[in-house]
């Protein structure tokens, strides 16, 4: 390859090069290793390549994120019926969600250590916990005449232990298997599958459970779906045979070194703090939307549709924005646009239930979902870029753990701020919505400070730079 040294040195990851055409492939930049013909005996260059088998893990991670979120929101969309079936109060049903959030926080240090070794082990641990947790819940719900609250709480905690292993995995998986042309989209697909599961729960569970006796079958159906979607975790490939690009083979910092970088980086915290808050409020509003809207005369189905709009519109919008960010790398601009929009949406939503008409809440929830869902993969990938060579699971697991912790705290605070039976209307959550709006507006300006005060060098996209800088002679990149 000595004759092509200068040419190879200029090649960049993800570029569409004539080399692909010379070797009989199209110029779409998506050539898989299984399709590669062997090189001549005289040329044995190092090649970076992607593999078709990466889609197995991506699909599995997507399915597991769907079902773990559906498991979380099994009871919230039918809180009244669930409370009757298990013989507890609605507050006790809220504590099922709270326990789920806190379970994430309890095991997130272990999650970082497991993901640091690779995503496959994390997938298998999550699959085992999801399957066990679901059937423990069903064991306490097998009778149509009433269930055992302790069993569903225990099962929910077990499922909560599973969530960090897959919710924090997308950035680690995309870093290992995808080039910089596809990482944001891969992270978006797998991360946003989690709220998709919540949308399915919001839409489907109220149709499965029309009366308290139906809760048993509802739990059974969710358990079967969760089991089927978790089984592929045991056949996911552990790692690509060769690195997909220069950044993928860059030695990652140790966990101790990573913790030091994380605690001392102002830029990371300017992104992490609003991420914590907005994920926490998203979890809170998803858990409590039924209780927010019903006091104003909305039905379970109307509240469920509102939750589904929040999620589905967000998914569609993120499907548009993620490929654009993948190509342009405008992470910072996107953060500075979407975070203020989210804050304004929480402020506007304070008055929406009082309209007693679905149009207002649905419109605000749609915009809130669009901005929130677009933000998630952008923020996670931007954190990875800022922290490189931190291993991606360090920033992503920390980000999600903070969001889950605040989600639990916000649900508890919202419950305490709920009006009594003498409220107008009784049991309204207006004060909780005001609290939500104030905190959301307080944190939304933080990303606006990124790159200011002479710290422009701190927001360089380090992983992208590692991928796109000149590649040494004898290296060929096939993205």
Swiss-Prot record:
<feature type="transmembrane region" description="Helical">
    <location>
        <begin position="149"/>
        <end position="169"/>
    </location>
</feature>
<dbReference type="InterPro" id="IPR011701">
    <property type="entry name" value="MFS"/>
</dbReference>
<dbReference type="Pfam" id="PF07690">
    <property type="entry name" value="MFS_1"/>
</dbReference>
<dbReference type="GO" id="GO:0022857">
    <property type="term" value="F:transmembrane transporter activity"/>
</dbReference>
<feature type="transmembrane region" description="Helical">
    <location>
        <begin position="363"/>
        <end position="383"/>
    </location>
</feature>
<keyword id="KW-0813">Transport</keyword>
<feature type="transmembrane region" description="Helical">
    <location>
        <begin position="95"/>
        <end position="115"/>
    </location>
</feature>
<feature type="transmembrane region" description="Helical">
    <location>
        <begin position="121"/>
        <end position="141"/>
    </location>
</feature>
<feature type="compositionally biased region" description="Basic and acidic residues">
    <location>
        <begin position="1"/>
        <end position="24"/>
    </location>
</feature>
<comment type="function">
    <text>MFS-type transporter; part of the gene cluster that mediates the biosynthesis of peramine, a pyrrolopyrazine synthesized in association with the grass host that protects the plant from insect herbivory. Probably involved in peramine transport.</text>
</comment>
<keyword id="KW-1133">Transmembrane helix</keyword>
<feature type="transmembrane region" description="Helical">
    <location>
        <begin position="55"/>
        <end position="75"/>
    </location>
</feature>
<feature type="transmembrane region" description="Helical">
    <location>
        <begin position="184"/>
        <end position="204"/>
    </location>
</feature>
<feature type="transmembrane region" description="Helical">
    <location>
        <begin position="305"/>
        <end position="325"/>
    </location>
</feature>
<comment type="similarity">
    <text>Belongs to the major facilitator superfamily.</text>
</comment>
<feature type="region of interest" description="Disordered">
    <location>
        <begin position="1"/>
        <end position="45"/>
    </location>
</feature>
<keyword id="KW-0812">Transmembrane</keyword>
<feature type="transmembrane region" description="Helical">
    <location>
        <begin position="218"/>
        <end position="238"/>
    </location>
</feature>
<feature type="transmembrane region" description="Helical">
    <location>
        <begin position="268"/>
        <end position="288"/>
    </location>
</feature>
<feature type="transmembrane region" description="Helical">
    <location>
        <begin position="433"/>
        <end position="453"/>
    </location>
</feature>
<dbReference type="InterPro" id="IPR049680">
    <property type="entry name" value="FLVCR1-2_SLC49-like"/>
</dbReference>
<keyword id="KW-0472">Membrane</keyword>
<feature type="transmembrane region" description="Helical">
    <location>
        <begin position="331"/>
        <end position="351"/>
    </location>
</feature>
<feature type="transmembrane region" description="Helical">
    <location>
        <begin position="399"/>
        <end position="419"/>
    </location>
</feature>
<protein>
    <recommendedName>
        <fullName>MFS-type transporter EF102</fullName>
    </recommendedName>
</protein>
<dbReference type="GO" id="GO:0016020">
    <property type="term" value="C:membrane"/>
</dbReference>
<dbReference type="InterPro" id="IPR036259">
    <property type="entry name" value="MFS_trans_sf"/>
</dbReference>
<feature type="compositionally biased region" description="Polar residues">
    <location>
        <begin position="36"/>
        <end position="45"/>
    </location>
</feature>
């Amino acid at each position: 390859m000595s004759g092509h040294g200068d040419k190879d040195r200029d090649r960049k990851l993800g570029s569409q090069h004539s080399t692909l055409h010379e070797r009989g492939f199209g110029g779409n930049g998506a050539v898989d290793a299984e399709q590669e013909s062997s090189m001549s005996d005289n040329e044995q260059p190092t090649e970076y390549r992607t593999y078709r088998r990466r889609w197995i893990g991506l699909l599995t991670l997507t399915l597991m994120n769907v079902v773990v979120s559906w498991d979380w929101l099994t009871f919230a969309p039918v809180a009244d019926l669930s409370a009757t079936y298990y013989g507890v109060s609605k507050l006790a049903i809220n504590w099922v969600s709270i326990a789920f959030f806190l379970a994430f926080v309890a095991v997130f240090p272990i999650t970082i250590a497991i993901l640091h070794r690779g995503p496959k082990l994390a997938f298998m641990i999550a699959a085992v916990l999801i399957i066990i947790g679901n059937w423990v819940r069903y064991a306490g719900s097998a009778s149509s005449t009433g269930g055992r609250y302790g069993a569903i709480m225990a099962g929910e905690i077990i499922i909560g232990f599973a969530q960090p292993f897959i919710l924090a995995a997308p950035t680690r998986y995309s870093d290992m298997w995808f080039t910089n042309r596809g990482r944001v989209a891969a992270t978006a697909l797998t991360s946003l599958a989690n709220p998709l599961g919540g949308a399915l729960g919001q839409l489907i569970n109220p149709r499965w459970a029309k009366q308290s006796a139906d809760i048993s079958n509802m739990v059974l159906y969710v358990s079967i779906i969760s089991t089927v979607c978790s089984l592929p975790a045991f056949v996911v490939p552990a790692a690509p045979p060769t690195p997909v690009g220069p950044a993928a083979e860059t030695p990652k910092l140790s966990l101790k070194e990573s913790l030091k970088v994380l605690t001392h980086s102002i830029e990371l915290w300017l992104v992490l703090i609003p991420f914590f808050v907005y994920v926490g409020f998203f979890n809170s509003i998803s858990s409590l939307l039924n209780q927010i809207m019903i006091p104003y005369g909305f039905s379970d189905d109307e509240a469920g549709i509102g939750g589904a709009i929040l999620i589905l519109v967000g998914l569609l919008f993120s499907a548009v924005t993620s490929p654009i960010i993948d190509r342009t790398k405008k992470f910072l601009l996107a953060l500075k646009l979407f975070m203020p929009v989210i804050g304004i949406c929480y402020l506007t939503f304070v008055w929406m239930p009082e309209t007693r008409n679905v149009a207002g809440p649905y419109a605000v929830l749609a915009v809130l979902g669009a901005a929130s869902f677009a933000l998630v993969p952008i923020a996670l990938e931007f954190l990875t870029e800022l922290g490189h060579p931190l291993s991606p699971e360090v920033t992503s697991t920390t980000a999600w753990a903070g969001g889950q912790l605040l989600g639990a705290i916000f649900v508890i605070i919202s419950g305490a701020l709920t009006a009594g039976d003498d409220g107008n209307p009784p049991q309204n959550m207006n004060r909780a919505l005001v609290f939500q709006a104030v905190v959301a507006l307080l944190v939304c300006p933080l990303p606006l400070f990124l790159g200011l005060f002479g710290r422009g060098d701190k927001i360089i996209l380090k992983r992208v730079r590692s991928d796109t800088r000149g590649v040494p002679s004898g290296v060929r990149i096939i993205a």
